[in-house]
Curated annotation (Swiss-Prot):
Full protein name: Lectin
Keywords (A to Z) from UniProt: Lectin
Keyword Transport: no
Function of the molecule: Lectin that binds galactose, galactose-containing sugars and gentiobiose. It is strongly mitogenic for human T-lymphocytes.
Top-rank taxon: Eukaryota
GO function terms (MF aspect): carbohydrate binding
PTM per Swiss-Prot/TrEMBL: N-glycosylated.
Record text on subunit structure and interactions: Homodimer.
Length: 18
């Protein structure tokens, strides 16, 4: 599933696809 983690990423969040 796609887990959206509020950490450093392209738009202020990181998209962690597991």
């Amino acid at each position: 599933s796609e887990s959206y983690t509020p950490i450093s990423g392209p738009n202020g969040y990181x998209v962690d696809v597991k």
